[in-house]
């Protein structure tokens, strides 16, 4: 997972840097054309994959029933439930800040496309550093504490980002946020996969993936709408403060969460739904 994060965030670091140059020297349309061309390479790689193992097919089940079972399982788990709830709040409250970079780069810092490229690339660079650090971390013990601590770091970094008018101070803030986001993302995914019953793993990870992808988008839309009335800073700052509040609430459950998330699920089973 750490290697996957390194690859993903390397692209996130290099992509905006290239896009900034293409937009500045050619046009926005040219940047989209280059982006589309990269997907062709991905499709060719997918078509050339061979020898994948066949997975056993279980009894068919309706999507609604399978989703309901996953929700019940997650809500009854003393580690997964608070982790997913905190992750939901923080993804909506803080992680959409990357989608707001165009507004900050132009309206707040007055840097235009090149400033946008620098902000996005700095987040990606921080994410790579976080992934490399997680790659060198050998054990799952203590991972719950690490994830919760860096969840707070994200919120504090975003608060500092919204409080400054200086571009040179904003860059370290987004670097720190990018580092913490990757550490929490890899850490939470590792804990969930380790703790969940194998029969529910796919559905729980799908729930995690839905939160991971939809949360920032929902947060960006919500904060973008509020920014028309309150400006860019206040909605993002309030989202970070709400995330801090949920972090404090979840922190009280850290010991119990660690006992279940860092243990073998066969040793500490969760009562199955139904």
Regions found by a protein language model. Name each.
Residues 1-274:
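Alpha-helical transmembrane-bundle signature of multi-pass membrane transport and export proteins
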């Amino acid at each position: 997972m750490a290697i996957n994060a390194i690859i993903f965030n390397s692209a996130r670091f290099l992509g905006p840097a290239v896009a900034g140059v293409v937009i500045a020297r050619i046009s926005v349309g040219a940047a989209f054309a280059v982006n589309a061309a990269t997907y062709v390479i991905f499709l060719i790689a997918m078509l050339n994959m061979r020898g994948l193992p066949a997975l056993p097919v279980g009894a068919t089940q309706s999507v609604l029933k399978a989703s309901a079972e996953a929700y019940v399982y997650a809500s009854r788990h003393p580690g997964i439930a608070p982790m997913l709830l905190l992750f939901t709040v923080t993804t909506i409250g803080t992680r959409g800040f990357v989608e707001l970079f165009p507004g900050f780069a132009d309206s707040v810092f007055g840097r235009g496309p090149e400033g946008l490229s620098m902000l996005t690339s700095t987040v990606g660079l921080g994410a790579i550093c976080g992934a490399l650090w997680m790659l060198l971390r050998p054990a799952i013990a203590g991972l719950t504490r690490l994830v919760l601590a860096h969840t707070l770091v994200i919120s504090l970094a975003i608060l500092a980002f919204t409080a400054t008018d200086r571009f040179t101070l904003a860059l370290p803030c987004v670097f720190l946020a990018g580092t913490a986001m990757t550490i929490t993302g890899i850490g939470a995914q590792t804990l969930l996969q380790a703790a969940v019953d194998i029969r529910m793993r796919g559905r729980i990870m799908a729930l995690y993936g839905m939160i991971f992808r939809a949360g920032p988008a929902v947060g960006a839309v919500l904060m973008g709408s509020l920014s028309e009335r309150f400006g860019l800073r206040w909605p993002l700052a309030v989202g970070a403060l709400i995330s801090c509040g949920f972090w404090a609430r979840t922190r009280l459950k850290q010991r119990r969460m660690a006992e279940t998330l860092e243990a073998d699920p066969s040793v500490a089973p969760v009562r199955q739904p139904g």
